Amino acid sequence: MDDQPINIVTDIKNAICKDDLDSFIILMENNPSINLFCEPDKQSIDFGGIIQPIEFCKNNDLIKMVNEVDDQLIDHYISTVLREEVIKNCSVKILKYLFDMGLPVDFGRNFSIRLCSTKYLGSNHYIKENPGQDTLSLLRLLIEYGVDVNAHNYLPLYSAVSSKNFDKVKLLVENGANVLRVANGNENSFYFKIDSIKYLLDNGVEIDMNLSRALFLSIKDNSIECIQFYLELGADINKISPMDIIGLIKLRNIVGIRLLIENGFDFTSLNKLAGNNNERIIDVLINEANVDISALLKILLEFW
């Protein structure tokens, strides 16, 4: 690799940041060893003679081979960093030029669609919001060049719904996104987004989510709308335990309780729950102080 002055790479990054295509092309043409048009991730590094038994190599040969490998790794690193900068800065003009020059739209294991959808992949990988540059325009360009909208286990649609970006959700669905996959443990940030989920269902998108968990969270949140929605979607009410509905009782949510009754929840399971507990103050009040059960229940509900 030719030695690359730091200021050359910096100049290229500045052109990317401004989406200055003319300056970018001039810099790239004047520095041909920086190649952003291929996909280093899919190339094999030529280790040359390093494949042969190490004892047959002379010291000078080893140093030369190590330097050659280092040069290739540095080339790949610079190329990868600069290409990622194009995505992070939403540099649509430059990205279009790179695609036209042969850069695969799925470079870097679909780095572009992954970052464009979520805007944040880690401390060093996040979208920089610049005036006149937006991720929706970037997503349109990626789709125009044939990006897989269901890449990385349906991550794009998941990220768009998660970030509450309906324009992206709509664009992805219109271009073939067909599964919303919510992994176990992530329902907490999704169960209440029923408007987006309704839109997806109306447009034939498969919802791959733990509905019973979503129902539990809806009950816990005391949300009538969400409870009804997930019951209608087929959430298994038998997965709800007696302890899960205590909050509805405590908050006097009559509508929610009736919804559960109408959908087959067995409230007599509360009797078993109470019977399994050790002696408590309520047992003493009822059995030893002769307090009326109904009166005690009214008092508890009033001041709970």
From Swiss-Prot:
Q: Which SUPFAM superfamilies match?
A: Ankyrin repeat
Q: Which domain of life is it from?
A: Viruses
InterPro entries xrefs: Ankyrin_rpt, Ankyrin_rpt-contain_sf, Multifunctional_regulatory
Start-end of each ANK repeat: 7-36, 77-107, 122-151, 152-181, 183-209, 210-239, 265-293
**Which keywords annotate this record?**
ANK repeat, Repeat
User: What is the name of the protein in this document?
Assistant: Putative ankyrin repeat protein R598
Organism of this sequence: Acanthamoeba polyphaga mimivirus (APMV)
